Amino acid sequence: MHLLVVSQYFWPEDFRVNDLVSGLENRGHKVTVLTGLPNYPSGLLDIDFIKNPSKYRKYNNVDIIRVPIILRGSNKIKLLLNYVSFALSASTIGVYKLRKLNFDLIFVFEPSPITVGLPAILLRKIKKVPVIFWALDLWPDTLNAIGIVKSKFILNLIGGLVSFIYNRCDLILGQSKSFLPHIQKYSNHSNIKYFPGWAESVFSDIKDENSLPHNKKSFDIIFTGNIGDAQDFPSVLNAIELLKADSNIHWTIVGNGRLLSWLENEIVIRNLIGSVTLAGRHPINKMPYFFNKAD
């Protein structure tokens, strides 16, 4: 089968879709990926991509079709423009670049935003092939939960967009069983299935590495991942402040994101330098070592 994977994020960005695509290719499928420009999580264009963009036209034997987008930047307006720009660019430039290709199936990877489904359902109509939509984030629920959108009117509009997309997919996959009733609320068909994520193979054999930040005398709390709005770092910092009197507790934050500069400033302002280590971004194969240090 020739499969088209539509994802706003793809290698060199670290997302599970990379493993999914490799797995599909290893099973003998021909895979093409429609994606944007790598700028997650920093909001800046990937340095290696800038130096050698031709290197990122292929992922093993997988063809990568990239479309121009507005970069995520460091504020909510730029993030919104980033979301909209991919949907528009993939629905126009992306569709044009794919005009001579035929597919048997379209697979959508949606960690956020929901708008990644728009170019997919347009291509569904043009190519006359089914769409599978893997929902890893729940819109509009997530927007409301993290306070990005509070207006009921706007949330209802977004809910209408979610229904529009869901109802034009042939199969919807939810990464958690608790997702399924939420998805059903915005869909008029019952073809909704549970499809969980998985751990990368590097986590099967965790080894020690003494070069990583670690204080054997402390109780180590470690966070790894994106440093953004959804992670609610104001609450994390409040917790660190409450516990900073206990010198045996140490926090390590591994990752990068739009709010990294803000986090660095807040740590200084709140006098938390002795309680927190910002370890920066590390490749996935280093993550098991950090997890091994966590209490």
What is the predicted role of each segment?
Residues 1-57, 243:
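N-terminal subdomain of nucleotide-sugar transferases
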Residues 184, 193-194, 198-217, 232:
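Acidic anion/phosphate-binding donor-loop and adjacent secondary structure
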Residues 170, 275, 291-295:
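Acidic donor-binding loop of glycosyltransferase active sites
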Residues 14, 80-95, 105-127, 132-136, ...:
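An aromatic- and histidine-rich active-site surface loop
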Residues 218, 252, 261-288:
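Nucleotide-activated donor-binding/catalytic signature segment of Leloir-type glycosyltransferases, i.e.
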Residues 213-231, 236-241, 252:
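Conserved donor-binding/catalytic core segment of Leloir-type glycosyltransferases
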Residues 115, 122-126, 152-172:
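Membrane-proximal helix-turn-helix segments that form the acceptor-binding/catalytic region
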Residues 37, 178, 195-198, 281:
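Carbohydrate-associated surface elements
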